[in-house]
Regions:
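Alpha-helical structural motif
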Residues: 40-43, 75-78, 99, 197, ...
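Charged/polar, solvent-exposed surface patches and flexible loops
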Residues: 46-49, 81-85, 101-105, 168, ...
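Predominantly the structural core of cysteine protease catalytic domains
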Residues: 76-117, 191-199
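Short alpha-helical interface elements
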Residues: 68, 72-73, 107-108, 128-132, ...
Length: 238
């Protein structure tokens, strides 16, 4: 990954990616039974290889998925695993200015920014684009406020948006609503590679296996399913 490049006054393109030529990672291959997992897992699965790291090495945590009584674990890549494997320090971004201004500042420092946004303004969001309002997470890697253009990872790929979508995504200061949750990614080191990465990943697998659920999560879900179905059947599905 090259260092951040200024493409114009007040704009940053961190990775120099092209939406037309970006190819999703193999974990997001179209022939998979479940192409997408959840917004946070998916965005990291694309961001990691863009930063030069194999996401497969960070998957040991998945053995800890459990049935939590009312849902299956909404799992995420553990931040401590990303640090240990890839030298990535993920920190919460304290928002006091506009999200646009913070994104520009952090990208200028070489830090990708993960932002909770309204998928209403994401052209790649399919049926919810300009219709529904659903919270999701994107990873910002390029921004040009003057051109009102934004480059980001979301779900299974790299995308760009501009114009009215940019305006909607980055609401002006003082607009109603709360600040979104944001994180930025600092690269503390080059990360592990080759045999060292394999060894560290296997070590994490042993760690997570020791903490895996004591009972079968699918069996626990099966036992709770009749009660859940009864509640759902009594609700207005609209």
């Amino acid at each position: 990954m090259s260092s951040a490049s200024r493409v114009g006054t007040g704009s940053v393109d961190l990775l120099g990616l092209d939406e037309a030529t970006w190819r999703p990672h193999a974990l997001h291959a179209a022939d998979r039974t479940w192409v997408e997992t959840n917004c946070y897992i998916d965005v990291w699965t694309e961001l990691l290889p863009a930063l030069g790291h194999p996401p497969e090495a960070a998957l040991p945590f998945t053995v800890r998925q459990d049935f939590e009584g009312d849902h299956f674990t909404f799992f995420k890549y553990p931040l401590e695993d990303l640090q240990a494997l890839f030298g990535l320090s993920v920190q919460e971004l304290a928002i006091y200015d506009s999200v646009e201004a913070h994104t520009l500042e952090q990208l200028g420092r070489g830090h990708p920014v993960l932002i909770e946004v309204d998928s209403h303004w994401l052209p790649d969001a399919g049926p919810t684009y300009r219709k529904g309002h659903v919270k999701t997470t994107v990873a910002a890697v390029a921004i040009d406020p003057a051109a009102r253009r934004f480059g980001y990872f979301h779900n299974t790929g790299f995308h760009t948006l501009q114009g009215a979508d940019y305006d909607g995504l980055f609401q002006p200061p003082g607009a109603p609503g709360m600040f979104p949750y944001c994180e930025f990614v600092k690269r503390d080191g080059p990360g592990l590679t080759d045999e060292a990465l394999t060894k560290a990943s296997l070590g994490l697998l042993k760690h997570h296996l020791a903490l895996r659920p004591k009972a079968n999560p699918v069996a626990a879900w099966r036992a709770a399913l009749p009660q859940h179905l009864e509640k759902l059947a009594a609700r207005d599905m609209d």
